[in-house]
A protein has these predicted regions:
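Interdomain regulatory linker/hinge segments that flank or connect interaction modules
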Residues: 1-43
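Long, contiguous, secondary-structure-rich segments that constitute the structural scaffold
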Residues: 2-6, 11, 15, 19-20, ...
Length: 182
């Protein structure tokens, strides 16, 4: 293993908090990253991007949704892109349930409807409240159902051993309203 001999904890490449265990190594020093145009990084604890963005799958869609967004029976079950946020984050940012939101990273913006739910709970980390934004990654610009792609927001970072993409966690900002750029 490239980052052996012993496993240790590293915060994601973009994290809202500093690594409490290893201040001298905030991130995995062996991680693969691509310092290329269009792939800027937020840095650790960047106040411009204070929220954790996590991407995930939905039961009704397969892989990135490229195959299932074209099936009418599946499109009916999950007809649009959405983001999940807590009632606390919705109140803090003036977001209405079902209203449009814009999720922003240094790499781009995405728009979706807000699903305000207790499933996405604020966390206490490093002595402060850290809010989470959940964004299913099955949507895109083609198919019977369309929507902003969560993958447009993620950075190009991978683990050092098998190059698994670190697209499941990053930092973002979220605001009420629909961006014209997304």
């Amino acid at each position: 293993m490239k980052d052996a001999p012993l496993p240790t904890h590293y915060e994601p490449w973009e994290s809202p908090v500093h690594n409490a265990l290893y201040r001298e190594h905030e991130r995995n020093p062996m991680a693969k990253y691509w310092d290329v145009e269009g792939n800027p990084y937020h840095g650790i604890a960047n106040p411009e991007f204070p929220y954790v963005l996590t991407t995930y799958r939905l039961t009704e869609h397969h892989t990135g949704g490229g195959m299932t967004r074209w099936n009418s029976w599946l499109a009916e079950l999950q007809p649009a892109a959405f983001v999940e946020i807590s009632p606390e984050l919705a109140a803090e940012r003036g977001i209405e349930p079902g209203g449009w939101v814009t999720v922003r990273t240094a790499r781009g913006e995405a728009v979706a409807r807000a699903l305000v739910t207790r499933r996405m709970r604020p966390l206490r980390v490093g002595g402060r409240t850290v809010h989470q934004v959940g964004f299913p990654w099955h949507f895109g610009y083609a198919g019977l159902v369309k929507g902003s792609s969560a993958n447009d927001l993620v950075s190009l970072v991978a683990d050092p051993n098998v190059s698994i993409h670190e697209g499941k966690v990053l930092t973002c900002d979220i605001r009420a309203g629909r961006s014209q750029r997304a």
